[in-house]
């Protein structure tokens, strides 16, 4: 995690140097196959090391969508373990995908904004 030594992890976003396991573009596509959406992200030193925006050395994780759906610390740990199993353990993304879908099935209501009974991803009429 970039900036961890400076206390920069008190945000809903973290940037991770992923170069030990591949490039950010490849990791982004792998996680997407498992229904985990992250973004590839250039690191400050990527250009000097020959990387570009398609194959950067980093990935960016944000927790705002998970939080909006009501997930808390325990679910974040579970998501981190799913990501680890994909990237480090090289598990099948389709197997992980079913676990992601199962986890998300319990979180279908928007929290912390709008009415608490608003269904997630349902079109909201703005008047």
Question: Where are the language model's segments positioned?
Answer:
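Conserved small-domain helix->loop->beta segment predominantly found in fold-type I
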Residues: 1-32, 37-57, 112-116, 121-127
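PLP-dependent enzyme catalytic core of the Aspartate aminotransferase-like
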Residues: 50-127
């Amino acid at each position: 995690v970039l900036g961890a030594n400076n206390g920069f992890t008190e945000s809903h976003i973290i940037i991770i140097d992923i170069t030990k396991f591949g490039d950010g573009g490849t990791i982004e596509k792998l996680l997407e196959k498992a229904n985990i959406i992250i973004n590839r992200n250039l690191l400050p030193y990527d250009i000097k090391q020959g990387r570009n925006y398609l194959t950067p050395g980093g990935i960016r994780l944000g927790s705002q969508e998970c939080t909006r759906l009501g997930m808390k610390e325990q679910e974040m740990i579970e998501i981190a373990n799913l990501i680890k199993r994909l990237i480090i353990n090289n598990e099948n993304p389709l197997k992980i995908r079913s676990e992601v879908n199962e986890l998300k099935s319990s979180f279908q209501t928007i929290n912390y904004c709008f009415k608490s009974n608003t269904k997630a991803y349902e079109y909201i009429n703005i008047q």
